[in-house]
Regions:
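Membrane-proximal helix-loop-helix units in multi-pass membrane proteins
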Residues: 77-128
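N-terminal membrane topogenic signal
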Residues: 1-10
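Hydrophobic alpha-helical transmembrane segments of multipass integral membrane proteins
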Residues: 11, 15-18, 38-42, 64-71, ...
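A cytosolic-side transmembrane-helix exit/cap motif
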Residues: 50-59, 80-84, 103-115, 179-187
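Long, highly hydrophobic alpha-helical transmembrane signal-anchor segments
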Residues: 48-90, 146
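Short, hydrophobic transmembrane alpha-helix segments
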Residues: 18-31, 45-51
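C-terminal membrane-adjacent module
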Residues: 117-196
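Structural signature of hydrophobic alpha-helical transmembrane segments
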Residues: 24-37, 163-166
Length: 196
């Protein structure tokens, strides 16, 4: 129960993270903000049952990075450490997706096989391409997130990391979904034409 509640609360906090950091920095509430983040990220690191998969690895890695940044921020009394969290999240996602390019099935292919275990060769090539596109997205997103940190403009940092990066991600997801629907329709048509 506590684990489920902390996971849900952490998801909300992660979505609102840029705005919470902006609020905490401008209100001088670093102790409250840092303490709250340490508590939430710490709860996310608690052991859970089941198999340790890549999604659990990702969640724990993100929580570990968040915990470390919050601790350093509190100890050094320097809020700028908190600004690096979106950069590290993009880096972790890049590692997860890129690593799968050297495995028999990419991450996107494994997700696609949850809906259709018998993917045709063209769909497998497509999922590899989508995985590569996501890798490119995480490189660009991480670079832009780092740029907002280095520019030192909290409003710009909050705007990009709290809104624009999500809009870019949603646009990529939506565009990929439309492209996938076209591919599925084309594959269905070619399958029907191939039948005697």
């Amino acid at each position: 129960m506590i684990r489920r509640l902390s996971t849900g609360l952490l998801a909300v906090v992660l979505l609102l993270y840029p705005f919470l950091v902006y609020w905490g920095v401008h209100r001088g509430e670093l102790t409250l903000l840092g303490g709250g983040l340490i508590l939430l990220f710490g709860l996310r690191l608690l052991p859970v049952g089941g198999r340790l998969g890549e999604w659990l690895w990702l969640g724990r890695s993100m929580a570990g990075c968040g915990l470390l940044l919050a601790l350093v921020s509190l100890v050094c009394r320097a809020s700028h450490w908190l600004l690096y969290y979106p950069v590290l999240v993009s880096l972790l996602l890049l590692l997860l997706f890129a690593r799968s390019l050297w495995q028999p099935q990419t991450l996107i292919e494994r997700l696609a096989r949850l809906q259709d275990p018998a993917l045709p060769a063209e769909a497998i090539r497509y999922t590899r391409g989508v995985t590569q596109v996501w890798c490119g997205f995480f490189v660009v997103n991480g670079t832009l997130a780092l740029t907002t940190v280095l520019l030192g403009d909290m409003a710009l940092w909050s705007l990009y990391n709290g809104l624009l990066s999500y809009l870019l991600m949603g646009t990529l997801m939506g565009g990929e979904w439309l492209l996938r629907r076209r591919l599925q329709a084309r594959l269905a048509t070619s399958t029907l034409e191939a039948q005697p």
